Amino acid sequence: MLRRVPWILLLAAGARADAPVAEPSDPAARAWVAQLDMHVLPRESGYLSLIATSAQKAVVGGRALAVQSQVYYMLTRELPANYLHWLASDDTHILIDGGPVDYFIFHPDGRAEKVTLGRDVAAGQVLVVPVPGGCWKALRLHPGAGFALMANALSPEWTPDRVRIGAGEAWIARYRGAAPWATDAFLRELIGPNFTP
């Protein structure tokens, strides 16, 4: 049995609800926003709609959490980046429509990888991106793409105390040079407006 998740959970993370909304220019993206009742995700950016949370529970860190929660998430030309954040939960992204999207994943052991979510499997793109819990990640819509709509499954459920948004110089120093693209300037760009000096 699944239950709807209240939108207020996202606001509990200290996010601002009054951020200006950038309406998508792509007609299909506009239709998805309306049909899925999507809202701009404060701080991380992009559009989000909560689907449900599993009624099954698991004990994690001494407390009972739902085994899984699911959301729709979308990037658009107007909101093409999902800024750097860390999740305690495993976060599996499944492409529904549009794309491609680059995922920049930063592992606790210092490794960094780039994975492209898209339909061109022959070119190395993937339809599903599993991001292990405890990793940092940021997403960027490919230039020229109108939007990318994904379904995300978070296991165990998303809770506001199990996410961190943004980073600073120490984080940049840790991942600098971990991949050819991991320059100071690009890592700072992935952090976006959530840079913490």
Locations of regions flagged by a protein language model:
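Non-catalytic, conserved peripheral segments adjacent to functional cores
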Residues: 20-129, 138-139, 145-146, 156-159, ...
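Bacterial N-terminal signal peptides that target proteins for export
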Residues: 1-6
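Hydrophobic h-region of N-terminal signal peptides that target proteins for export
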Residues: 7-17
